[in-house]
Structure formats: structure tokens, C-alpha cells
Regions:
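N-terminal "mature-domain start" segment
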Residues: 36-65
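Secretory pathway targeting signatures of secreted, lumenal, and periplasmic proteins
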Residues: 58-117
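Short, well-ordered beta-strand elements
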Residues: 2-7, 83-88, 172-180
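Secondary-structure transition/turn motif
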Residues: 75-78, 149-151, 180
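Surface-exposed amphipathic alpha-helical segments
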Residues: 10-33, 55, 61, 172-181
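Signature of long, low-cysteine stretches enriched in small and polar/charged residues
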Residues: 1-2, 6, 112-172
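Short, surface-exposed beta-strand/loop "edge" segments at domain boundaries and coil↔beta transitions
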Residues: 5-9, 79-83, 92-95, 153-158
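Charge-rich, low-complexity N-terminal segments
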Residues: 24-34, 45, 76-81
């Protein structure tokens, strides 16, 4: 218990990053626990059989598109729509894990696999707003986290995305899992 309001304010200012990190971690763990209990078997089964990737997506993710090295799933909701993509590509260069390379790869994969509703329209990274790339360690392994905005070239859609990029050493490939709204 804090002795007074001023000490709470001072503590919060002094330990701002630690407090934010704590609440983010607690919320992430809550979401992980929920996804371990209830998840989309459609997504899990298709990713496991086609890309040899295990991923728990929310249970309401049922609509999907599956091609070689690319998987897309959505809750297909009229409001509160969420999408998930997973794609892989061969690991050939240590420079793969840079913001520039991953944005270029993302754009080429999305252009080929997520066309818009109008001819010639496609999804791409909105680089004018800036993209944030952060290397982290996840379960003892390197992971690149990219956050930014996407837009539909030739159409009027867009929103935020977060992607996690990891090296699959066993299969000599890079695996990207991304969520966007």
C-alpha cells in the first residue's frame, strides 16, 4: 500500500517501462491461455498438414485460402474483422532478418496472394507511416517482430498489422505469421 497519491505517481513515472511491460506480459499470457483452450481446428489442421506449422488461431477463424507456402484465414466478420496469414520462403541469406528485406518480401507475397476486389488492386505495406522492426527472443529463439500499417493499392482499405518472423533451421526456411485488421 502506498502512503499517498504522490508516491504512487512518482513510482509510476520512475518505473513506467517496467509497469507497461508487466501489463503487456500479463495480457499476452491471458490470451495464450485462452487460445490453448479454444482455437480453430480448421486453421491448426491446414497449417500442420500443408506448411508443417502449428499455430492456435481464434476459434472463429474458419474461412481460409491455402496455396503452396501461403495460408490465409479470417473470421470474415462484417465488423471486427481479423485476418491471419502464414507464409514461408527459403532461408538463403543472413540479411533476411532486416526491415527492408522483410517489407519487400511481405509486399511481393501479398501482391501475389491477396488481390483486392478491383482489377490490379492488391495489399501492400504502407511505408510512408513508418514500419517498426524489433528483434526479440521468443522461447529461446530469435524472432523479428514487425509492426506497421497495410493498405490496398488501387482500393480504399487499410489497417494495422503485426508479424512475427522466425527461422526454421530444420527445414532451412523462414516462417512468417501475421495478424491484421
Amino acid at each position: 500500500k502506498a502512503p499517498n497519491t504522490e508516491s504512487i505517481v512518482e513510482y509510476s513515472k520512475t518505473h513506467e517501462k517496467a509497469l507497461v511491460d508487466f501489463f503487456v506480459k500479463v495480457e499476452m499470457n491471458r490470451a495464450i491461455e485462452q487460445l490453448q483452450k479454444e482455437y480453430s481446428m480448421v486453421v491448426m489442421d491446414n497449417l500442420k498438414s500443408d506448411l508443417n506449422v502449428m499455430l492456435n488461431a481464434p476459434a472463429n477463424f474458419t474461412y481460409y485460402k491455402d496455396t503452396t507456402d501461403f495460408f490465409w484465414s479470417s473470421n470474415n466478420a462484417n465488423t471486427g474483422r481479423m485476418d491471419l496469414i502464414v507464409y514461408t520462403f527459403p532461408y538463403t541469406d543472413p540479411n533476411t532478418f532486416t526491415e527492408e528485406y522483410l517489407v519487400a518480401k511481405r509486399d511481393s507475397v501479398l501482391k501475389a496472394n491477396l488481390p483486392g476486389s478491383f482489377p490490379g488492386s492488391y495489399m501492400q505495406t504502407e511505408t510512408r507511416a513508418g514500419v517498426e522492426y524489433t528483434p526479440i527472443t521468443l522461447n529461446g529463439k530469435y524472432c523479428g517482430v514487425m509492426r506497421g500499417l497495410w493498405r490496398m493499392q488501387g482500393d480504399m482499405m487499410g489497417g494495422p498489422f503485426v508479424s512475427h518472423t522466425r527461422l526454421d533451421e530444420k527445414n532451412h526456411r523462414v516462417v512468417v505469421a501475421e495478424g491484421f485488421v
